[in-house]
Amino acid sequence: MSVAQVRLKALLFNDTSSENHHGCQLVMRQIFTLAGQVGMDIQRSCPMHHDWQTDIDLQRDIRAADLCLVNGEGTMHDDAPLALRYGALARYCQEHDIPCFLINSVWQNNDQLNADAHCFTKLFVRDTMSKAALADVGVSAEVVPDLTLSYQHTASNSLRHGMLVNGSVIDERLLEAWRTVKDRQDLRYVSIRTLAPLQLGKGFDFYLRKNLRKRLKALRRIAASYFYSYPAHLPAPLIDRLRWRYAVLSTHRFLNLLGRSRGVITGRFHLVTLCLVTGTPFFALPSNTHKIEALLAQVGLAERLKPSYEQAVNAADRIAFSESELTSIGSFLQETRMQAEAMFREMAQIARAANTPDQR
């Protein structure tokens, strides 16, 4: 068997598939798909909040792995505790000569974490702003956009109709979105929530039990959400129930809903990416990092960023994509898929080179 055919033992960190979110689940699906295409076998996939530093068995598996992948989604900013944990992982891998790659990541407002950035074998960030932040501390990175954008959606031929409004990870923004929907009869609220998948074979025995508990808890919340009314001025305790009340649980149905709508107004990054994937016109509001602004700048859609839901709704008659925007989006998605595939090929090549007899 040639070196290029040897299967690589990979460990994945920050598996977000249990986070009740269509975007997170699609990211993980794409990571497993792209890794498999280049001969990476992800033997263990570490849940988002599992601490590798207290898991002796996992540390042993790290030292025996051919490479480690860190999904930076939602973590590598503001010196967050999870960010520092993955920075320490990169340092640990470096000490034990295990290639460690950061993928699918933002990088913003870090100080302590910057000290560990150079420990990653290579960093692949989602946007040019993150690349610039790393360059400011002397660390090079490559830009590969969010991995949801590498997903190829089969568009339906049905006519688009209806406007969808989605909230934000920021509660104040979500409340603003809900007030806007309640004031208009022509708007439909939709949540990006979904159920945690039931899954086995990811190298952590508690995965199935954990996700089963999460599913049962979520199903109870979904059922309860239908027994509440949701006034325009929504009390904070009802925010979680609102998200479940307007969830579309199937990713396939959710993407088809986007694909049938005339447009979407959202403050969530992954709903922006899924609008791009489904070819759905949208207006976006800023989120908790620069991720939305940076993505829109990359695609050439910076003018689709709006300061408020009210202003976005007032501009809804101009939400349709222009021909030049459609061309830019098509080119961007094609390039993104190529970049994602090239990123995994490069990581596999580096790991194989590091595992040749004269290197290990």
Task: Outline where the language-model segments fall.
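Active-site anion-handling motifs in enzyme catalytic cores
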Residues: 1-360
